[in-house]
């Protein structure tokens, strides 16, 4: 039987999805980087790692996390995109990141939305842009073949979890 694919070279308007996941080895390398010389790179890395530790939580969900979402050793929140309720066991590496940043006087868990009086969505978008530009810089420093963004943490967690049958 001869198989022919007459449309093999026809563009369908759908590009192949670029793989955004990185292996666990790269996640460890990102985690272990000494970024004490640049607080904005360190902040971006810490938010990337927080996302990874929280099963690849999206940046918008991290931005809107409230301290009240953390109770009895669990982080419980509604995903903005799907309105799905998610519950994640609170682990030491998550707490270490939270402890590193001062959010006293704020109801937010992470220092992304800093001023309740200012447009929250604008603050989130500005922070996302800053963090992703810093992550791209980090990715270049370690020679990643793809741009490092907050989205990579989500895909990395999913890929690593799948490989471990989680």
What name fits each language-model region?
Residues 1-15, 111:
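Short, charged hinge/linker segments at domain and secondary-structure junctions
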Residues 32-39, 132-166:
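Short, basic (Lys/Arg/His-rich) helix/loop patches that form interaction surfaces
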Residues 30, 47-50, 158:
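Short alpha-helical "packing" element that flanks the helix-turn-helix/winged-helix DNA-binding module
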Residues 17, 35-38, 76-89, 117-127, ...:
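Short, contiguous acidic/charged loop-to-helix segments that flank catalytic cores in large enzymes
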Residues 10-43:
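Long, amphipathic, Lys/Arg-enriched alpha-helical "connector/arm" segment
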Residues 1, 51-72:
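Short, charged phosphate-coordinating catalytic segments
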Residues 21, 26-28, 91-145:
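Active-site/catalytic core of tyrosine-dependent DNA strand-transfer enzymes
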Residues 5-10, 64-100:
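Conserved tyrosine-mediated DNA breakage-rejoining catalytic core shared by Y-recombinases
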């Amino acid at each position: 039987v001869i198989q022919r694919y007459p449309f093999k070279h026809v563009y369908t308007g759908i590009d192949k999805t670029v793989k955004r996941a990185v292996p666990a080895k790269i996640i460890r390398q990102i985690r272990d980087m000494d970024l004490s010389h640049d607080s904005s790179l360190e902040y971006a890395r810490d938010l990337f790692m927080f996302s990874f530790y929280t099963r690849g939580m999206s940046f918008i969900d991290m931005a809107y996390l409230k301290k009240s979402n953390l109770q009895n050793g669990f982080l419980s929140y509604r995903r903005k995109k799907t309105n799905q309720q998610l519950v994640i066991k609170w682990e030491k590496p998550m707490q270490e990141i939270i402890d590193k940043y001062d959010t006293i006087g704020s109801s937010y868990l992470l220092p992304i939305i800093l001023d309740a009086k200012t447009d929250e969505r604008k603050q989130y978008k500005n922070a996302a842009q800053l963090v992703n530009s810093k992550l791209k810089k980090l990715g270049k420093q370690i020679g990643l073949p793809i741009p490092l963004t907050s989205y990579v943490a989500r895909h990395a967690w999913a890929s690593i979890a799948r490989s471990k049958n989680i």
